[in-house]
């Protein structure tokens, strides 16, 4: 079975697949223009968030039997179409959950204590203690939109910090230690709102101007899920008006952003989609990718 690894993947995982008898080629920097001429020769492929597998590409790959996404979301793959064509589509939903959850908590702490502003002030050789009075997370209400693997990990950590945790997720009936509420209830009650949902058409623009109006004044927003879930213009307006006190973003509508005005706001913390970028998560992702492909090849 021939596998093309299109994005950076741990070499231990690649060697594990080869040791199991798979023929594995790596083209970590393959371009969208090259894919239609290269991928048709392969039975399977491994992708991360960079490489997109869309219908036109699937149509020119008659040998393709399996696509494995190293990560959580499948929005970079036309998964339903692939399955209609008899292609198995898999991901690694739990491998990076802890890393994304820890980044989310880190973002909340930075927002609560204005650490990003305090650090910038010190680098400008200013000693301005009185300017950076913050808030404790304990006793605050955290609203989690999406109580799947990552959402549950965030909830567990937030509870240990003494936060009251509520969640909105129409896909589950219960989550340990979390009170499930409607979206409107969450928007009205939360001091911090964090997003952990995929981005199919149903969640695109899920938080827009109308939703921001329902939130508490001074709410803080964290998005480590997908950029399209929040309407950028609505978030920008809420941040500049003071409705939203601060936001922390790891994901964007376009990556890298085409418009940087949101990123440049003083009350926005930002990172270049590093939620899963820990050594531990990358090792788990690679191992799970290898195990899934080896198991598939043995069927």
Task: Give, region by region, the residue ranges found by the protein language model.
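Phosphate-binding beta-alpha-beta segment of Rossmann-like dinucleotide-binding domains, i.e.
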Residues: 85-87, 93-141, 153-156, 160, ...
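Phosphate-coordination loops involved in phosphoryl transfer and adenosine-cofactor binding
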Residues: 64, 138-141, 209, 218
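Glycine-rich Rossmann-fold phosphate-binding loop(s) that bind the pyrophosphate
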Residues: 147-148
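Structural/interface elements that position substrates and couple domains in central-metabolism enzymes
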Residues: 2-4, 9-12, 22-26, 94-99, ...
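Rossmann-like adenosine-cofactor binding region
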Residues: 51-58, 164, 170-261, 277
């Amino acid at each position: 079975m021939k596998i093309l690894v299109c994005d950076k993947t741990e070499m231990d995982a690649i060697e594990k697949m080869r040791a199991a008898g798979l023929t594995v080629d790596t083209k970590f920097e393959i371009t969208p223009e090259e894919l239609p001429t290269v991928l048709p020769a392969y039975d399977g492929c491994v992708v991360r968030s960079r490489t997109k597998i869309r219908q036109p590409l699937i149509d020119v790959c008659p040998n393709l039997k399996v696509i494995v996404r190293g990560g959580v979301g499948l929005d970079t793959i036309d998964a339903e179409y692939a399955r209609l064509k008899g292609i198995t589509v898999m991901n690694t939903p739990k491998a990076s959950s802890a890393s994304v959850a820890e980044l989310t908590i880190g973002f909340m702490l930075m927002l609560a204590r204005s650490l990003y502003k305090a650090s910038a002030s010190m680098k400008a050789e200013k000693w301005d203690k009185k300017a950076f009075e913050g808030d404790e997370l304990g006793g605050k209400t955290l609203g989690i939109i999406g109580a799947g693997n990552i959402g549950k990990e965030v909830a567990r950590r937030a509870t240990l910090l003494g936060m009251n945790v509520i969640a909105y997720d129409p896909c589950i009936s219960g989550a340990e230690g979390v009170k499930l509420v409607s979206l409107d209830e969450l928007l009205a009650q939360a001091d911090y709102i964090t997003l952990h949902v995929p981005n199919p058409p149903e969640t695109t623009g899920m938080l827009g101007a109308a939703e921001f109006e329902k939130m508490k004044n001074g709410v803080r927003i964290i998005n480590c899920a997908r950029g399209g879930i929040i309407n950028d213009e609505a978030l920008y307006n809420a941040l500049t008006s003071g409705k939203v006190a601060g936001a922390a973003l790891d994901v964007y509508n376009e990556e890298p952003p085409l418009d940087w005005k949101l990123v440049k706001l003083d009350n926005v913390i930002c990172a270049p989609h590093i939620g899963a970028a820990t050594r531990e998560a990358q090792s788990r992702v690679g191992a799970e990718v290898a195990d899934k492909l080896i198991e598939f090849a043995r069927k």
